[in-house]
Amino acid sequence: QAEDGIRDSVASRGLGDVYKRQALIDFIEFKSTYLLKIAGISFSVCIPVWYLCRKATSFSNKDVFLVIVLSWVVASIFGSIPFYYSGLFTSYTNALFEAVSGVTTTGATILSDVESFPKSILFWRAFLQWIGGLGIVVFTIALLPLLGVSGEKLFNVEYPGPSSEKITPRIKDTARLLLSFYVGFTFLEFTLLSYSMPFFDAICHALTTMPTGGFSTFNDSINSQGMYVKSIILLFMIIGGTNFALHFRVLKAGPRGYLRDREFLYYIGLIALASMAILFTSNWYEEGSNTLDTTFQVVAILTSTGYTATDYSAWQPFIKQFLLFGLMFVGAMGGSTSGGIKLIRIVAIVKYARAELKRSLHSKAIIPIRIGQKIIPDEVIRKTIAFFLFYVSFFFIASFFFVMLGDDLQSALGAAASGMGNIGPSWGSYGAMDNYISCLLYTSDAADEGLGVDLGGRRI
């Protein structure tokens, strides 16, 4: 009984505290108590589940995957309740879409006039992304000692890949340290943004930048903001796309630690090359052709943040849009809050392909796969290739479903790549200055015709 109950406990623990904070904001603005009631319901559910599973001490492999899935499902359902009961969303489907987009930090929205919504709803959107950014699973790992449960398997599943590592001997201490960095960077960004933005806008953008989420309190995202705000957000998007374990090593060894990390050099190099390639093909009179806006948009796509500093879907020639489309698949560093395949996996696959080419010429050669000074085990390479194949396969499947729902090919490919990579804005019907309400209308029509489609995702 305890082992069965632990899945629900880990998925729901802490949600009551989240609702309590949101209820205060909502009460101040609306003089309403509906979120206080929701917080009470959350506590009434969490406490009995915790009591039933308090003696469980470990996870089986099956439990690990169930907890991962339940964490996102439960968080999305709970996250949609304030949206729905606010009366500002026309249907529960719209509320659930916005909540899933927030928790998974995808940043896709069905709202066409964000600025008309009350601050409590805008804060809740931002806070959902902040909670989802480093992973609800990591948040629960930090709380697992209260349950007496080991969280190592959860941590390894939530942050897989060649670059995953424990930065402290005990996994719960690692999770807590990651959270401290996460909170610290969020507060630092808020402080810097508050010099040029209103208090509320500064805190919301700080909450959505560090998780590389992209929800904004402005209708045009970051497009109308000044150079200072764009520069600060650009810096923290790069920080959010960096391996958090690397931040810890730099704290101990100094700034040169960044330069010693091979993946970080690839990361910065890719940003520079992509930005220069786009600038080289741009016309000086074209909107968004300046260095800051171009670099901002490259980083926003690569890190899956999804902010828009310009309408990149109107860029010409088309090769510039195609380059951004490719960056949607790559993603930033492993161990970061970004989406996509992750740069470290791409590097590992390229090195493996090169090694296999050499082996075809020298059949007896022993060629280890190295990234920096580290040799990547064959088992990790196999898992990396398997992940890559699954990712690409699901991209084509998702594209097919979007086409079946009535989208043109450009919109379908863009929406699938954006959804898989947790980016948000895309191309075509879901362009940089558009929203996803048409996607819900297509899905609703398909449901009426008996076609059930479940589209969702979480950064990996």
Segments (PLM) and residue ranges:
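Right-handed beta-helix
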Residues: 1-2
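Membrane-proximal intracellular helices of multi-pass ion channels
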Residues: 7-444, 458
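Short "domain-exit" segments at the C-terminal end of structured domains
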Residues: 445-460
